[in-house]
Amino acid sequence: MVLSSSLFVQKRSTTTALKQPKELGHYSRTQDNGFLVNDDSRLAYYYLPDTDLDKKLDLLSGIKKFKECNTEEFDSTTLHGLLSTLEEYERRKSKKTKVDIITFRGIIRKLISSAFDSSQFNPVNFRIVSFDGQLFIKEVKTDASETSINKNRESLQARAYYSGYKFEALATLSLPLPLVPRTTLEKRPKKIINNGDQFISMVRTGIGKCKILIGAEVDCIFDFKEDSDDNLKHYAELKCTTMVNTVSDAHKFERKLFKTWLQCFLVGINRIIYGFRDDNFMLKTVEEFTTSEVPLILKNNNPQMQTVCVDAIKWYGAFTEWLLTSIPRPEDDIDTIKAYKLIFENNHLKLTEIESDDEEYKQLVEGEEILSNSFKQWRKDLRK
């Protein structure tokens, strides 16, 4: 019998017990589609002195030279870099990592957001494989031509998209400040930008009884990097948005801040830095928030968002519990892989098993759409 289950978005768990996030490893992803395990060459360092804000920084400067890496060949949703990092970690420990779900932060954020946003603004189209007692969740790659900035660089959407990357480039350095030549500092506004170079942190966390391993892109180090395995307390999230001038603007920003809070609290990033721009995409001000203060800001400023953060955590607990209860995860059968489709429609998360005659089945179960062959072999070798 084919497995099928659904969960209404109003469902809430009684638990709000979150596990303390811990960084287990990291990797760098290159713009030419490479994965560098335990490499921090793509890690950036925050540097945006107040005097820079007086220089009329243009967040559209260089948009025509922007290198868009979201192409057919570049799968931004692949788990392979995360799995390679996990494999290296397990080889050092000589044992399997005890978690129930392995995925990216963006997937968990979208699943949480499904209780607050419509599917039009928060599309959920995921694939899950059950292997070796664990669930691996991947987002279905969208058509690059639909999401690419190359479609129309003059559109408001494309300019807003680019301005976020530009803000990151203006606010960060590729090395700690003492190691950066003055000429490099002065040329920062002219730096050509791409969205393929990424630094990804591998974090173990969870809620209730569910243990989760999450890959999360890190924007920058805020202060300094320790020579240790866990630098979560030093990371910062960078965002750029329009200035807040009206009550309507404030409520719009609060909704954005809630989503940013979700991103950060999931993996234990404590600092959020927002750049505010005018309608001409000139950077005007920068404001810092601690992740822990965001729920209080939302509660005090917007009556409609008084309980939204606690609500989000209870929904997080509900859908992870539902996934673990619904999908069989046999620990003693390393040779069986089963695949599932997870979508969001009509106010429900819907889970359906993918049968062997489905066109997706072969790549999901026998191919490398989610699990790499090397990772599957490693888990088999671990049992010998």
From Swiss-Prot:
<feature type="binding site">
    <location>
        <position position="238"/>
    </location>
    <ligand>
        <name>a divalent metal cation</name>
    </ligand>
</feature>
<feature type="binding site">
    <location>
        <position position="237"/>
    </location>
    <ligand>
        <name>a divalent metal cation</name>
    </ligand>
</feature>
<dbReference type="GO" id="GO:0003723">
    <property type="term" value="F:RNA binding"/>
</dbReference>
<keyword id="KW-0694">RNA-binding</keyword>
<dbReference type="GO" id="GO:0004518">
    <property type="term" value="F:nuclease activity"/>
</dbReference>
<keyword id="KW-0378">Hydrolase</keyword>
<dbReference type="GO" id="GO:0000956">
    <property type="term" value="P:nuclear-transcribed mRNA catabolic process"/>
</dbReference>
<keyword id="KW-0539">Nucleus</keyword>
<dbReference type="InterPro" id="IPR013961">
    <property type="entry name" value="RAI1"/>
</dbReference>
<keyword id="KW-0479">Metal-binding</keyword>
<feature type="binding site">
    <location>
        <position position="263"/>
    </location>
    <ligand>
        <name>substrate</name>
    </ligand>
</feature>
<dbReference type="Pfam" id="PF08652">
    <property type="entry name" value="RAI1"/>
</dbReference>
<dbReference type="GO" id="GO:0110155">
    <property type="term" value="P:NAD-cap decapping"/>
</dbReference>
<comment type="function">
    <text>Decapping enzyme for NAD-capped RNAs: specifically hydrolyzes the nicotinamide adenine dinucleotide (NAD) cap from a subset of RNAs by removing the entire NAD moiety from the 5'-end of an NAD-capped RNA. The NAD-cap is present at the 5'-end of some RNAs and snoRNAs. In contrast to the canonical 5'-end N7 methylguanosine (m7G) cap, the NAD cap promotes mRNA decay. Also acts as a non-canonical decapping enzyme that removes the entire cap structure of m7G capped or incompletely capped RNAs.</text>
</comment>
<keyword id="KW-0547">Nucleotide-binding</keyword>
<dbReference type="GO" id="GO:0000166">
    <property type="term" value="F:nucleotide binding"/>
</dbReference>
<dbReference type="GO" id="GO:0005829">
    <property type="term" value="C:cytosol"/>
</dbReference>
<dbReference type="InterPro" id="IPR039039">
    <property type="entry name" value="RAI1-like_fam"/>
</dbReference>
<feature type="binding site">
    <location>
        <position position="219"/>
    </location>
    <ligand>
        <name>a divalent metal cation</name>
    </ligand>
</feature>
<keyword id="KW-0507">mRNA processing</keyword>
<feature type="binding site">
    <location>
        <position position="239"/>
    </location>
    <ligand>
        <name>substrate</name>
    </ligand>
</feature>
<feature type="binding site">
    <location>
        <position position="217"/>
    </location>
    <ligand>
        <name>substrate</name>
    </ligand>
</feature>
<protein>
    <recommendedName>
        <fullName>Decapping nuclease RAI1</fullName>
        <ecNumber>3.6.1.-</ecNumber>
    </recommendedName>
</protein>
<dbReference type="GO" id="GO:0110152">
    <property type="term" value="F:RNA NAD+-cap (NAD+-forming) hydrolase activity"/>
</dbReference>
<dbReference type="GO" id="GO:0006397">
    <property type="term" value="P:mRNA processing"/>
</dbReference>
<keyword id="KW-0540">Nuclease</keyword>
<comment type="subunit">
    <text>Interacts with RAT1; the interaction is direct, stabilizes RAT1 protein structure and stimulates its exoribonuclease activity. The interaction also stimulates RAI1 pyrophosphohydrolase activity, probably by recruiting it to mRNA substrates.</text>
</comment>
<dbReference type="GO" id="GO:0005634">
    <property type="term" value="C:nucleus"/>
</dbReference>
<comment type="similarity">
    <text>Belongs to the DXO/Dom3Z family.</text>
</comment>
<dbReference type="GO" id="GO:0046872">
    <property type="term" value="F:metal ion binding"/>
</dbReference>
<feature type="binding site">
    <location>
        <position position="168"/>
    </location>
    <ligand>
        <name>a divalent metal cation</name>
    </ligand>
</feature>
<dbReference type="GO" id="GO:0034353">
    <property type="term" value="F:mRNA 5'-diphosphatase activity"/>
</dbReference>
